[in-house]
Amino acid sequence: MSLSLWQQCLARLQDELPATEFSMWIRPLQAELSDNTLALYAPNRFVLDWVRDKYLNNINGLLTSFCGADAPQLRFEVGTKPVTQTPQAAVTSNVAAPALVAQTQPQRAAPSTRSGWDNVPAPAEPTYRSNVNVKHTFDNFVEGKSNQLARAAARQVADNPGGAYNPLFLYGGTGLGKTHLLHAVGNGIMARKPNAKVVYMHSERFVQDMVKALQNNAIEEFKRYYRSVDALLIDDIQFFANKERSQEEFFHTFNALLEGNQQIILTSDRYPKEINGVEDRLKSRFGWGLTVAIEPPELETRVAILMKKADENDIRLPGEVAFFIAKRLRSNVRELEGALNRVIANANFTGRAITIDFVREALRDLLALQEKLVTIDNIQKTVAEYYKIKVADLLSKRRSRSVARPRQMAMALAKELTNHSLPEIGDAFGGRDHTTVLHACRKIEQLREESHDIKEDFSNLIRTLSS
């Protein structure tokens, strides 16, 4: 049986799975084939359980398709593949890394075999300002399809800091939970190791600290502080744009931390390569570990967020009321929580029960603004402008991909962002049947799973239409 069997499986899995999933769960696996058994070694129990639950059938199916009745048995273990004298025994991934996956860079120093916790310089260290908010944990982070991968990656980093996903780069629009996950990772690391030096900050704080260090002739103390942390969590890294001196210092800090296996987590409102005003060498390093998008929450997640928030406030929120709010406010978690706080405050002040009619009254200006902003007409104009076509093309019978794909995108957005029925949406797109609209919605949902470009287009348009 060929020792390239696992490489064949990897190649097929890379074609079949979204790039981020492949990078996060499949790429870290090591494989060893012996005695008709294929042993897969996962870096930790979390990855092992996830792969076994989610991808066991996929892998077994591939083994059967390649080997037929001679397919090897699968065995999962936590750890690394035993080292042997035979070079061919190394059955590791050589599949080319896709755009959003972890990549090995020639410039990066080989990781130390010691844990990042052991590499921290001793004595004469400054007092660390953790700034981690203890209220933001994984337990109170509402998971949904839109943020599932981001949460899973953050959870794994908290369990194994300085490991495979270093740096971890989370990106997405405002109010989607990036900061919550940063704090959750910090809390997770400190729960496992209470004396860990975990520092959370906004990128502007890093800039301010550096400026102050330069003014006070204390740049060496600044370097020692930031390069001796166990985990550095920086929010809104895009604010480094056009700050050349800060970028220079962060570049060297970044390298020092990675060489010491100390964890870095960064967030931004956009994909690393799209951050203007940041040096290419930094943007390249941002993608060395794992880059994961957080999407605007889908309807079910928005409802779950509202119900959990109400429960935290000891408020009974009827399901139909949560659905009513979630259906109308779609842009981000912060907007949802703000609306619910407003409803709760009004209910407390008036002593009235929280019903749909009460919510309509309490949020009337917000709902009116939302309905005014997002109309099918507005969606069509925005999509046409985004794809550089005419609105008339969206309404036409043309079927070329350059028109059909934007038309499907516009239909999917109309279903997501308005309260119109499928027949009403079809009528607005040149009198099309409701089944055409349904097909368009399903097609875009499928493409968002398979294509980074489509996922980005959808997120960008949602953000534009909801802002």
Swiss-Prot record:
Annotated SMART domains: AAA, Bac_DnaA_C
Key words, A-Z: ATP-binding, Cytoplasm, DNA replication, DNA-binding, Lipid-binding, Nucleotide-binding
Domain I, interacts with DnaA modulators as annotated region, ranges: 1-90
Gene Ontology MF terms: ATP binding; ATP hydrolysis activity; DNA replication origin binding; lipid binding
Alphabetical list of NCBIfam families matching this protein: DnaA
Function: Plays an essential role in the initiation and regulation of chromosomal replication. ATP-DnaA binds to the origin of replication (oriC) to initiate formation of the DNA replication initiation complex once per cell cycle. Binds the DnaA box (a 9 base pair repeat at the origin) and separates the double-stranded (ds)DNA. Forms a right-handed helical filament on oriC DNA; dsDNA binds to the exterior of the filament while single-stranded (ss)DNA is stabiized in the filament's interior.
Comment field on protein domains: Domain I is involved in oligomerization and binding regulators, domain II is flexibile and of varying length in different bacteria, domain III forms the AAA+ region, while domain IV binds dsDNA.
Protein's recorded name: Chromosomal replication initiator protein DnaA
Organism: Shigella dysenteriae serotype 1 (strain Sd197)
